[in-house]
Structures are given as structure tokens and as C-alpha cells.
Swiss-Prot record:
It holds the Pfam family UDG. GO terms for biological process: base-excision repair, AP site formation via deaminated base removal. This is Uracil-DNA glycosylase. SUPFAM superfamilies: Uracil-DNA glycosylase-like. The gene is ung. It catalyses: Hydrolyzes single-stranded DNA or mismatched double-stranded DNA and polynucleotides, releasing free uracil. It comes from Vibrio parahaemolyticus serotype O3:K6 (strain RIMD 2210633).
Length: 226
């Protein structure tokens, strides 16, 4: 029998909490009212679907989902195939091209292969209304994602947290740095990337930290087309 804890084991109880029920009811009511809410209901929890709890090696924290049509699919910074690569991800690719030998910038922004290797691509808030950034902040999602980070902090060892921008850094302030590794930099947004995100070498550093623990490094290379 597999004794490894799953997401259900570590955050299953959260789904019974009144705040979480209220959050889901709010989102459902917004959809029922005819508002375009992203990502689609089936994709809201994809970060957990593609990266099982016990497989988490790296956590990248985003803020809220992309709010344009067909962009968000439940993994922070990632967009569906066929959608133009958003500006922050363009800068992530620029950094990868400098940092990871042989990295070729793909023609898409679909990051699922990272998630499948143990990179938890977690937004702080898991839904958004079309065209309205942060429209679902303070609806309970932040509490839920705090619990997610607390569970990783408590039950795992040697996870590498990539915290880009003040929002992510504030969110990760309680991470136990004697158990885990925290790499902080400005956000990859065009507004701040040149203040130290570009040149941060977080992708190679994350792999060095994983390798030093005997863990398999992340293959950051993406298929050129999807």
C-alpha cells in the first residue's frame, strides 16, 4: 500500500471548511449569472491534478489567472496551446535562454510538462472574471492557497520555492527556510523584470539545489511546438 500522502490527505479537510464552500459557491454563482470566469470549471484545480503532493520539488507562485479568453488553464504563467505567449512568460523564456544551456524559446506558452515533473504552478487566487484582474481576490482563495503552502512546508523537505515579486514573497514569508529553499527575485512582468529577474538564474539554481539532495533535476526545456 502506498503510504505517500496525497493532496486529498493534506488539504482534503479544507474542502469542508465554510470559507471554501463559500468560495466555490461564489464562483458558481458568477458563472450562473452569465459572467465569463476563467479558467473553466474543469481546469480550476489543474495545478494539483498535474503535480501530486508527494512529487512537488519546485513551487512557482503566481497571483491570479490570466483574464483573457482561452488563456488560463489552472497553471500559473502557462497558457493553452495556440495562445500568444504573455509578456511575463516571454521574460521567463528570456531568462531560461540565458540560464539553461541549449534552451530554445518555444512558439507557445504551455507549461504542463513542468507540472508533470514536479513543478507546482500555483496561483494565489484560482479564478478571475474576464478582463478584470484581481476580481476574485479576497473571496477565500488566498486562505486555501495559504493552507496548500503550509501543507508543503510542514510535510515536505527540500522544496525549492521561486518567489517572484512582492506578492509572492509576502505569501511565502512563513516558509521554514531551514527545511526548504527560497529563491526571491522581482516579478518577470515587463514592469519589473529588468530590476533583477533577468539574470537571477533561478532555474539552474533550483536544479543545483535538487541535485544536491539527490533529487532528479527539472528538465526546463519545452517542446518547441504543441
Amino acid at each position: 500500500m502506498n503510504q505517500s500522502p496525497t493532496w486529498h490527505d493534506v488539504i482534503g479537510e479544507e474542502k469542508k471548511q465554510s470559507y471554501f464552500v463559500d468560495t466555490l459557491n461564489f464562483v458558481e454563482a458568477e458563472r450562473a449569472a452569465g459572467k465569463a470566469i476563467y479558467p473553466p470549471a474543469k481546469d480550476v484545480f489543474n495545478a494539483f491534478r498535474f503535480t501530486e503532493f508527494n512529487d512537488v520539488k519546485v513551487v512557482i507562485l503566481g497571483q491570479d489567472p490570466y483574464h483573457g479568453p482561452n488563456q488560463a488553464h489552472g497553471l500559473c504563467f502557462s497558457v493553452l496551446p495556440g495562445i500568444k505567449t504573455p509578456p511575463s512568460l516571454v521574460n521567463m523564456y528570456k531568462e531560461l535562454a540565458q540560464d539553461i544551456e541549449g534552451f530554445q524559446i518555444p512558439q507557445h506558452g504551455f507549461l504542463q510538462s513542468w507540472a508533470e515533473q514536479g513543478v507546482l504552478l500555483l496561483n494565489t487566487v484560482l479564478t478571475v472574471e474576464q478582463g478584470k484582474a484581481h476580481s476574485h481576490s479576497k473571496t477565500g482563495w488566498e486562505t486555501f492557497t495559504d493552507r496548500v503552502i503550509e501543507a508543503i512546508n510542514q510535510h515536505q523537505h527540500g522544496v525549492v520555492f521561486l518567489l517572484w515579486g512582492s506578492h509572492a514573497q509576502k505569501k511565502g514569508r512563513f516558509i521554514d527556510r531551514s527545511k526548504h529553499h527560497v529563491l526571491a527575485a522581482p516579478h518577470p512582468s515587463p514592469l519589473s523584470a529588468h530590476r533583477g529577474f533577468l539574470g537571477c538564474k533561478h532555474f539552474s539554481q533550483a536544479n543545483q539545489l535538487l541535485a544536491s539532495q539527490g533529487k532528479e533535476p527539472i528538465n526546463w526545456h519545452l517542446p518547441l511546438t504543441v
